[in-house]
Amino acid sequence: RLLENGDIDCLWCDYSPCYREDKYYWTEPYLTVTVSVAAKKTSGIKSLAHLDGSKTIAVIAGSVSERRLLAGDLEISPDVQIKSYGSAELCKAAHAKGYVDCWMADVQPLDRLVARYPGLYRVFADNVMTVDLGVAFDDGYEGPIVKDLNTALFAMDRDGTIDRIVGNYKTGATTGGQGANP
């Protein structure tokens, strides 16, 4: 609503065009993040194939992970229960408390979970998907900002700025050579 009302100019925080292509006017993708799943080592869950109707998986509400699971786009039993939470912290808490069997998210918080509790959790060896991130503007936007932002993002990709930022904050994220094209 804030975007539609003009209270803000854009949405730019781990935001993906996936399943939203026609809802917003997008910049070119500037970053690709890897999505995987974490499970307790004692669970026996090592891949999506190990999930059956008795298992539950935590996802962030509104995320690409949630949308793909609900759409049946991933090779997973349709009987797996999907529990949607409002944040990564809530997913992590639900997983730690045993309310869910595993947690699907960007690898960054999953890797932090494994590092914080060595020997307790594992992240699937096979990544589930990659997700392109972009900046979303109101669908009716016609100004020069998107073109200027694409140009700036392309330059930041080309000169290594995005990779340096990613290196500081997001294990498992890369530009994948996708930096916005001018």
Predicted regions and their residues:
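Bilobed "Venus flytrap"/periplasmic-binding protein-like clamshell domains
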Residues: Y15, V33-L90, V107-P109
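Ligand-binding clefts/hinges and TM-proximal coupling segments of bilobed small-molecule sensing domains
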Residues: V64-Y85, P118, R122-F124, L153-P182
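A ligand-binding cleft/hinge motif common to bilobed small-molecule-binding domains
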Residues: E4, W12-K23, R68-A71, A96-T130
